[in-house]
Design a protein with these regions (language model features):
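N-terminal segments that cap or nucleate solenoid repeat domains
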Residues: 1-41
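Glycine-rich hexapeptide-repeat left-handed beta-helix
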Residues: 2-13, 41, 45-47, 51-57, ...
Length: 194
C-alpha cells in the first residue's frame, strides 16, 4: 500500500484494526477508523490545498468500507466524512465537500459531489448526487441524477430487503478488515493463526 504525507506535512492516521489492501493509496490528511476495509486500487487523497495552504480532512469512521477502485478526494480546503458502517462500492467517486451518514450504501460507479446524505441512505448503481442533501432512510434508484429537492420527490424509503443487503455488505467488509489487519500485523492468513 502507498501511504504518503501531503505537501502540508499531513500524514494519514490509520487505526491498527483497519485493513488496507496492498494496492490502496492513502495520501495526506486522512483518518481511517477501526475495522475499516480499504479495497484494491482504492485512492483516498487529502492533498488539495485551499488558498491559505491548509488541507481539509477525509474522515472514514469505524466499520465503513471503501471497495475496489473507489476514489475519495476533496476540493481545496474542504473535506469528506464517511459515517460509521457505510459501504462505498466498487468504482464509486466521493468528492468533497461531502458528508455521508452512518450505515449508508453507495452503489457501483456512483458519484457523490458537494452533497450530504443522511443516515441509512442507499444509493444504487451509477447514480449522480451533486449539490444535494438526501434525508435519512431514502433509496436513490440506479442511473438517477439528483441535483435538487424536486429530484428527491420520487424517492421511496429503504425497504427491509435493501437494508438487509446493506447490512450484509457491511458485515462482509468488517470481516475483510479483520483478515487484512491480521495479515498486515502477523503475516498469517486466518484468524486461527495458521
Amino acid at each position: 500500500m502507498m501511504i504518503e504525507v501531503n505537501h502540508a506535512g499531513d500524514r494519514p492516521g490509520i487505526a491498527a484494526t483497519a485493513g488496507l489492501h496492498p494496492s490502496a493509496v492513502v495520501i495526506g490528511n486522512v483518518e481511517i477508523g477501526g475495522e475499516v476495509y480499504i479495497g484494491p486500487n482504492a485512492v483516498i487523497r487529502a492533498d488539495e490545498p485551499s488558498a491559505d495552504g491548509s488541507v481539509g480532512a477525509i474522515i472514514i469512521e469505524r466499520e465503513a468500507n471503501i471497495q475496489d477502485g473507489v476514489i475519495i478526494h476533496a476540493l481545496g480546503g474542504t473535506g469528506v466524512r464517511i459515517g460509521r458502517g457505510t459501504s462505498i462500492a466498487h468504482g464509486a467517486v466521493v468528492h468533497g465537500p461531502s458528508e455521508i451518514g452512518e450505515n449508508c450504501f453507495i452503489g457501483f460507479n456512483s458519484v457523490i459531489f458537494k452533497a450530504s446524505l443522511g443516515d441509512g441512505v442507499i444509493v444504487l448503481h451509477q447514480a449522480l448526487i451533486e449539490d444535494a442533501a438526501i434525508p435519512n432512510g431514502l433509496v436513490v434508484p440506479s442511473m438517477t441524477a439528483v441535483r435538487d429537492k424536486e429530484d428527491m420527490m420520487r424517492f421511496a424509503p429503504v425497504s427491509p430487503e435493501l437494508a438487509k443487503f446493506a447490512l450484509k455488505v457491511r458485515q462482509t467488509n468488517v470481516f475483510l478488515a479483520e483478515v487484512s489487519s491480521l495479515i498486515r500485523s502477523t503475516g498469517k492468513s486466518n484468524r486461527s493463526g495458521e
